[in-house]
C-alpha cells in the first residue's frame, strides 16, 4: 500500500466500471444527477441529517481545505502541529481556500495545551494586525 497521496495509485476496476455505467445516457448537471442524488440521500441517512448538504470534491486536499474554510473567518488562525497533515502535505491549499493563517504550535506531533495557550496569546498580542 502507498499512502503518499490519495490520487497516487491507479483506479480500481469497480470504479472504472461505475464510471462507465454513469456515462450511459444523459444526466442533469450541477449536482442534480441521479448518482449525486443517491450519494446525498445515503450520507443524509448515515449521519441522520436529512438537511445535510453534500458536495463531492476530487481530492483529500480539496476536502480538508474546504472543511477548514468553513470553521474560521479569513482573518483568523488555524493552529496545527508542525508535523500535521495540513501543514506537511497540503501545501498552501488550506490557507488559499480559507484565507486563514496556519500557525504551528510546538515541535512534536501532539499539541501541548500550554504551548497552544502561548501561541494563542502571541497571536492575540498582535491586535488588529494578527489573526
PLM-predicted stretches and their roles:
Residues 1-2:
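Extreme N-terminal starter segment of soluble prokaryotic enzymes
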Residues 7-11:
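Short polar catalytic/cofactor-binding loops
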Residues 39-42, 48-54, 77-79, 109, ...:
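Structured catalytic cores of enzymes that bind and process phosphorylated ligands/cofactors
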Residues 12-60, 82-87, 93:
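Conserved N-terminal alpha-helix of the aminotransferase class I/II PLP-enzyme fold
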Residues 51-72, 104-110:
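Conserved core of the PLP fold type I
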Residues 97-131:
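PLP-dependent aminotransferase-class I/II
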Residues 70-88, 117:
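Conserved PLP-anchoring active-site segment centered on the Schiff-base-forming lysine
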Amino acid at each position: 500500500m502507498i499512502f503518499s497521496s490519495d490520487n497516487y495509485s491507479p483506479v480500481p476496476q469497480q470504479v472504472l466500471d461505475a464510471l462507465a455505467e454513469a456515462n450511459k445516457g444523459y444526466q442533469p448537471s450541477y449536482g442534480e444527477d441521479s448518482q449525486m442524488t443517491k450519494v446525498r440521500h445515503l450520507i443524509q441517512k448515515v449521519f441522520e441529517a436529512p438537511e445535510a448538504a453534500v458536495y463531492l470534491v476530487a481530492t483529500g486536499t480539496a476536502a480538508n481545505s474546504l472543511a477548514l474554510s468553513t470553521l474560521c473567518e479569513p482573518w483568523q488562525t488555524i493552529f496545527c502541529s508542525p508535523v500535521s497533515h495540513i501543514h506537511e502535505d497540503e501545501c498552501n491549499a488550506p490557507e488559499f481556500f480559507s484565507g486563514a493563517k496556519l500557525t504551528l504550535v510546538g515541535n512534536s506531533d501532539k499539541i501541548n495545551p500550554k504551548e497552544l495557550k502561548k501561541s494563542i496569546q502571541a497571536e492575540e498580542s498582535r491586535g488588529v494586525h494578527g489573526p
